[in-house]
Amino acid sequence: MSVVIDGKYLILKDRHYTETDEWILINGNIATVGITDYAQKKLKDIVGIELPQVGREVTIGEQVAVVESVKAAADIFSPLSGSVLEVNKELQSSPETINKDPYGRGWIFKLKIKDEKEVSKLLNFEQYIISIKQREGI
């Protein structure tokens, strides 16, 4: 299930979100992380990415990756504490995949969650919709 905000921003109901526009899909103690449709549309044409190193221990809110577009570079933050299990190597040669499929093939990294209690700090889809509406003045 999904929701479209203001006729342009797709939000999936099965994800968690952050105020910094990362989405998180949790399966057991594994979190798959990417940037939202809202974020990729704000960045426009994505041309590069710096991925985190597999095995890296990260804490909630830590900068872990950078997405580069023709317009700007955007830091990607870890939504939870844990260790990086996998990165989407396809993005190194095809970073535009994030623009084409931000919630699917455009995922950025997978994280083994260290503290499942941190999940409660994430936004649900309704809270994320409110966040976007406030920023966009809609």
From Swiss-Prot:
Purpose:
The glycine cleavage system catalyzes the degradation of glycine. The H protein shuttles the methylamine group of glycine from the P protein to the T protein.
| UniProt-recorded name of the protein | Probable glycine cleavage system H protein 1
Q: What positions does the domain Lipoyl-binding occupy?
A: 30-112
InterPro entries, per this entry? 2-oxoA_DH_lipoyl-BS (IPR003016), Biotin_lipoyl (IPR000089), GCV_H (IPR002930), GCV_H/Fam206 (IPR033753), GCV_H_sub (IPR017453), Single_hybrid_motif (IPR011053)
What organism, scientifically named, is this protein from? Answer: Sulfolobus acidocaldarius (strain ATCC 33909 / DSM 639 / JCM 8929 / NBRC 15157 / NCIMB 11770)
Q: Give the modified residues of type N6-lipoyllysine.
A: K71
Per its UniProt record, what Gene3D superfamilies does this chain match?
A: 2.40.50.100
Q: Which domain of life is it from?
A: Archaea
